[in-house]
């Protein structure tokens, strides 16, 4: 019988790589340089989790939510609003099922597809009101990288919820369709349509 060979602790720690839901690797690339440090995927080992539930208190300081793994942020967005609020286990099951569907549709790593969808669905330009009262007017402004991620997640989850309402498709199927379409910059995606509307309005207010 062969004897077990002990490995140094450093070697074991270096080779250890968790997988999301014990299936999907975190070995993904972020093509947008401005979002690379804010997506919290593989820049640090603590972002690579088996389950998207870290029980972190990300609300106690501004900008602390950039330390929240991006898949967990998607799960938290799925808990909005109404009857799904607070049901994180349900939201995690929906995201896991949608990732399975994404893998079947694209034969790619679902985390990579999600990252591409966030990059494509995040608006780069928006408009805001400048002035007070009767002198107020709309002014085009650049969108910060953190708000780009927030907007992309919000628009994708809002689109899949509205698509699943009074529809034979499940919420997981609608979420998978939304993410796949957004990753391809397809206008069938609710988030892509909203992003283009926002950028068109901003362009007219330059």
Swiss-Prot record:
Keyword Ribonucleoprotein set for record: yes
**Pfam families given for it?**
Ribosomal_S7
One Gene Ontology cellular component term attached to this UniProt record is:
ribosome
Reply yes or no: does the keyword Ribosomal protein apply.
yes
- Subcellular localization: Cytoplasm
Q: What is its main location?
A: cytoplasm
Keywords of this entry: Cytoplasm, Ribonucleoprotein, Ribosomal protein
Identify the CDD domains for this entry. uS7_Eukaryote
Q: Which InterPro entries match?
A: Ribosomal_uS7 (IPR000235), Ribosomal_uS7_CS (IPR020606), Ribosomal_uS7_dom (IPR023798), Ribosomal_uS7_dom_sf (IPR036823), Ribosomal_uS7_euk/arc (IPR005716)
Q: Which SUPFAM superfamilies does the protein's record reference?
A: Ribosomal protein S7
* MF-aspect GO terms: mRNA binding; rRNA binding; structural constituent of ribosome
Enumerate the Gene3D superfamilies for this protein.
Answer: Ribosomal protein S7 domain
Q: What does this protein do?
A: Component of the small ribosomal subunit. The ribosome is a large ribonucleoprotein complex responsible for the synthesis of proteins in the cell.
Q: How does it assemble?
A: Component of the small ribosomal subunit.
- UniProt protein name: Small ribosomal subunit protein uS7
